[in-house]
């Protein structure tokens, strides 16, 4: 075994996926691994770099396709990817990097605001050595929340936003509204 593997962090919005991604990458940095993070370039809510909803910032490469950064990451042994659901080549990229001996950590939504799967992320599950599903707090009743609910009427899947556009909700509050 070459040590390469895939860690997948999934859950609804506001569940701490990006925070957990940053925590894991920092652990590897402390252990003297050469690390890089990649964020989806169309996500520019807070500025450059990888940002959490509570405004923590971490340096990151930006791309819309992961194959575009292949040449920039050859020297790194740990690759963190945020908003993995938006990368069309996430499955092939992660499998290739893990097979080359790299540790790949992906933070991603597992479902849309309509509770439909992000198929590229579901296709990563059988290829991953570790899968963690986080929950958030329901922004309506304050119980455990497993779903993201869009506040507006837009129907497009890729609309990037924060708590101005989305809420994390439990099953009861998702179905009841």
Curated annotation (Swiss-Prot):
Keywords: ATP-binding, Disulfide bond, DNA synthesis, Kinase, Metal-binding, Nucleotide-binding, Transferase, Zinc. PROSITE patterns: TK_CELLULAR_TYPE (PS00603). InterPro entries: P-loop_NTPase, Thymidine_kinase, Thymidine_kinase_CS. Pfam families: TK. GO terms for molecular function: ATP binding; metal ion binding; thymidine kinase activity. The keyword Disulfide bond applies. ATP binds at residues 11-18. It catalyses: thymidine + ATP = dTMP + ADP + H(+). Zn(2+) binds at residues 138, 141, 170, 173. The active site is at residue 83. It is an enzyme of class 2 (transferase). SUPFAM superfamilies: Glucocorticoid receptor-like (DNA-binding domain), P-loop containing nucleoside triphosphate hydrolases. Belongs to the thymidine kinase family. This is Thymidine kinase. It comes from Vaccinia virus (strain Ankara). The lineage of its organism: Viruses, Varidnaviria, Bamfordvirae, Nucleocytoviricota, Pokkesviricetes.
